[in-house]
Amino acid sequence: MTLVSIITNALATIGRSTDAQSMDAWKQKFTIFANDGAKDLAHYLQLRRTDTITATDNQIDINDLPFDCEKVVSVKQNGSDLSFTRGNASNKINVGVNGDVEVEYRYLPKDMADDIDQPGIPEHLHHLIIPYVVFKEHMTADPNTQRRADMYWQDYDKGRRDAKKTYGEEDTYKIYNAGWF
């Protein structure tokens, strides 16, 4: 789903026209809301990706990763796990080796700006951004309109809670004691 389709669907949901003039009037505000929604989903679901970067002086710089890094989960070189610690600066991590390493990390998507940009989250989650945008719009309106915001928040929140069951870190999984054999 592209940014323009997110904005168009959000405008239709709140009962506004989706002509070119309306799109221009609402684009900046709804783009901010859509970017906030994509980042909220990525943070809540603890979305991960793995990218290869080069370690120099036994350190990696998380600014070399293509997306904003919330947390480094693992570092590997040639398929072997590496231990890692904080480096000598807030953006450095000691990995104890030089060369290319694969970094698995929790990320935040890049901001959308152009009409054809897509949220940097899995495609099947894109539809959740629309109720988030509508929720944010209702929350910035008059008190009568704010009362309707809860309905859109519930729709968004249910979708992200349902998605949480299949995303995230190990703390989302449970191990049950099956007893002694």
What are these model-predicted stretches?
Residues 28-83, 122-139:
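Divalent metal-cofactor coordination and adjacent catalytic microenvironments
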